[in-house]
């Protein structure tokens, strides 16, 4: 029987390159070029000839502008942690399947199909000061005044959670379901408690998937825009960095300054991803 020739590592593979080429071109056209063009615009201030860092100096010298970074982090980080923990809890509990699993999963992922605008409108209708929840509580005599759950920090967190929980839940459910169940059974046969199995066996195996889910949810949370406008205070406590960029671009018509803010936003996301990747490497099982 003739042996099948194997390809040495590092040897050029034309077929593989042809398969990668469409994706590479897409990334270059849709991500790399816009970023480089935005970087170019940010270095060409409207009122200064030639290249300059004036836009970045203006941004970091104005507390009203650079404060949007911390506001955005204060929304993205807590939401990401809550989404990840709840998704992990449910996905870990559903990894073996149970009665009506498909029905429960469908209900949990339903918000994905609604879209950001429709979901925000639904939150306003249910959690708003004149929404169903407050009207029901007042009618039952449980409260005398409505809870203020929208047009503030809480409203934006509610929207972010409902948008991103289904995505994170599906990702973790698929990842956890792919872990060999015999590893868990073997640990239990050796006398390990359920908590020990989770902490010593399952958690190290889930760590790479948790890191990826955390990174993706964080990036989406950091880019919050419609929810911060519709359910928050876009000129106050929920004025995120994306809102600052929008205001400069479409209210002040200063595309150069808006590009600088967008670049700062991208660099913040990139720095966070680097930290997450480094932590993922440390947590990965050896």
Predicted segments, located by residue:
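Short, Lys/Arg-rich, polar N-terminal cytosolic tail immediately upstream
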Residues: 1-11
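Membrane-water interface segments at the C-terminal ends of transmembrane alpha-helices
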Residues: 12-46, 63-146, 151, 156-176, ...
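Glycine/proline-centered hinge or cleavage motifs at structural transition points of membrane proteins
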Residues: 190-191, 204
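Short cytosolic juxtamembrane segments of multi-pass membrane proteins
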Residues: 7, 196, 277-286
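Transmembrane helix boundary and interhelical loop/hinge segments in multi-pass membrane proteins
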Residues: 49-52, 129-130, 175-185, 194-196, ...
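Short membrane-interfacial helix/loop motifs at transmembrane-helix boundaries
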Residues: 2-4, 25-63, 130-131, 231-238, ...
């Amino acid at each position: 029987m003739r042996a099948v020739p194997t390809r040495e590592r590092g040897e050029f593979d034309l077929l593989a390159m042809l398969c990668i080429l469409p994706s590479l071109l897409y990334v270059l056209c849709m991500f790399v070029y816009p970023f480089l063009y935005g970087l170019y615009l940010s270095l060409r201030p409207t009122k200064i000839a030639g290249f300059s860092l004036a836009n970045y100096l203006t941004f970091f010298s104005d507390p009203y502008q650079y404060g949007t970074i911390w506001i955005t982090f204060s929304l993205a980080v807590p939401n990401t942690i809550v989404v990840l923990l709840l998704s992990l809890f449910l996905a870990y509990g559903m990894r073996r399947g149970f009665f009506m699993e498909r029905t429960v999963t469908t209900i949990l992922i339903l918000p994905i199909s609604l879209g950001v605008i429709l979901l925000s409108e639904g939150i306003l209708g249910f959690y708003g000061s004149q929404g169903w929840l407050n009207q029901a509580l007042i009618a039952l005599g449980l409260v005398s005044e409505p809870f203020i759950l929208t047009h503030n920090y809480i409203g934006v967190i509610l929207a972010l959670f409902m948008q991103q929980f289904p995505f994170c839940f599906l990702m973790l459910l698929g990842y956890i379901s792919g872990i060999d169940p015999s590893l868990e059974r073997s640990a239990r046969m050796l006398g390990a408690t359920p908590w020990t199995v989770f902490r010593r066996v399952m958690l190290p195996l889930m760590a790479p998937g948790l890191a990826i889910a955390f990174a993706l949810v964080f990036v989406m949370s950091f880019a919050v825009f419609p929810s911060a406008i519709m359910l928050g205070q876009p000129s106050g406590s929920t004025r995120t960095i994306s809102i600052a960029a929008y205001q400069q671009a479409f209210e002040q018509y200063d595309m150069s300054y808006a590009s600088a803010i967008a670049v700062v936003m991208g660099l913040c996301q990139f720095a966070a991803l680097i930290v997450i990747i480094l932590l993922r490497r440390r947590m990965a099982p050896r």
